[in-house]
């Protein structure tokens, strides 16, 4: 069983037990898509709160999510990503709720979303952007969840790992497309994935390169084709996350 298969099997159990919440008022912040379109001179940063991962194990279990997020915001991050998976990433929806209460910028719910219940829960907790991972969904499931998220006035970051998945993301009209440099079946990371997939960019979407970034030189590799990078582990391991985040803001 691959990492992804194991995660999805557990996620089905988690979602089956999850209550269906009533839709509450949406948190007010700016559109991340509009922000990226308006701020093109620099590579923008999605900075992540992540305690652990299936491949690396514990990364920073003692982190204060709010303090970490506020450091990112002070560094000029355009959005905070919060892992909410409790089993494999040691996150929680409460982490997201607390972060969203304490920052002004958009918050991304980073999880393996397979149900509308998760979309509503994320919105109610303060997320204004949600992640849909193409490799975790059938084409019909992706289309339905994309429609449901849009109906909830959530922005959708559609994650791809290869050219076929990119074609599907562009076909459904995704405005935010993330290229994950991590293979979710093996969890191996290679920034060259983004460099390769970028050859097929053909829409008015904004593009985010995800995973594997540790230095400004890493970010420079994708700065021409991408609008932003998503960085988690490198920032979570650094004792001075604000400085670490600032160091990744390079010119495009």
Swiss-Prot record:
**Is DNA-binding one of the keywords?**
no
Under Gene3D superfamilies, the record lists: Aldolase class I (3.20.20.70)
Q: Which PROSITE patterns match?
A: IGPS (PS00614)
The GO terms describing molecular function are: indole-3-glycerol-phosphate synthase activity; phosphoribosylanthranilate isomerase activity
Supply the alphabetized keyword list: Amino-acid biosynthesis, Aromatic amino acid biosynthesis, Decarboxylase, Lyase, Tryptophan biosynthesis
User: Can the keyword Amino-acid biosynthesis be found in this entry's annotation?
Assistant: yes
Reaction equation(s) it catalyzes = 1-(2-carboxyphenylamino)-1-deoxy-D-ribulose 5-phosphate + H(+) = (1S,2R)-1-C-(indol-3-yl)glycerol 3-phosphate + CO2 + H2O
Q: Which GO terms describe its biological process?
A: L-tryptophan biosynthetic process
Q: Which InterPro entries match?
A: Aldolase_TIM, Indole-3-glycerol_P_synth, Indole-3-glycerol_P_synth_dom, Indole-3-GlycerolPSynthase_CS, RibuloseP-bd_barrel
| EC numbers | 4.1.1.48
Highest taxon listed in the record's lineage:
Bacteria
Please state the pathway this protein functions in, per its UniProt record.
Answer: Amino-acid biosynthesis; L-tryptophan biosynthesis; L-tryptophan from chorismate: step 4/5
Q: Which family does it belong to?
A: Belongs to the TrpC family.
Q: PANTHER family, alphabetically?
A: INDOLE-3-GLYCEROL-PHOSPHATE SYNTHASE, TRYPTOPHAN BIOSYNTHESIS PROTEIN
Recorded protein name is: Indole-3-glycerol phosphate synthase
At the highest ranks, the source species' classification is:
Bacteria, Bacillati, Bacillota, Bacilli, Bacillales
UniProt gene name: trpC
